[in-house]
């Protein structure tokens, strides 16, 4: 059993420890955020950080949702979906994404976008099963 909830300011120290465990499971390209970066994220009006808590209240998953306005409407994007490797396959990722979809819709977003590494086969199957469609577009990145 697990609970999906938004993070509040008092969760920041615990989240710091959880991200030190979770972010390396997601990517080797970026280090876990510092406490200052977590606090800045929590203060952002456009960002919602969702976490999954296990029965023992430990953080076993997280997801970042950004909802923002552009001239053509309200957009939303999911980033950094991660579930602890020890509890994968229990529906935690699905519950996180479903809650993010609800929040984005409540905030007036016309659609929700996400990207996923093709090597993350389970995650890609989940997104397709939840109704996401592959976009016929090029994704670009510019690194500073």
Regions found by a protein language model. Give the residues of each.
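Conserved acetyl-CoA-binding loop-helix of GNAT-fold acetyltransferases
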Residues: 83, 89-102, 125, 129
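Conserved N-terminal entry element of GNAT/NAT acetyltransferase domains
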Residues: 1-13
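Conserved beta-strand in the GNAT
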Residues: 51, 58-67, 77, 82
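Active-site rim helix/loop that mediates acceptor-substrate recognition in acyltransferases
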Residues: 30-49
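A conserved beta-turn-beta hairpin within the catalytic core of GNAT-like acetyltransferases
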Residues: 68-78, 88, 135
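Conserved GNAT acetyl-CoA-binding A-motif
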Residues: 97, 104-116
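Helix-loop element at the rim of GNAT/NAT acetyltransferase active sites that forms part
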Residues: 10, 19-32
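Conserved active-site alpha-helix within GNAT-family acetyltransferase domains
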Residues: 94, 106, 118-136, 141-142
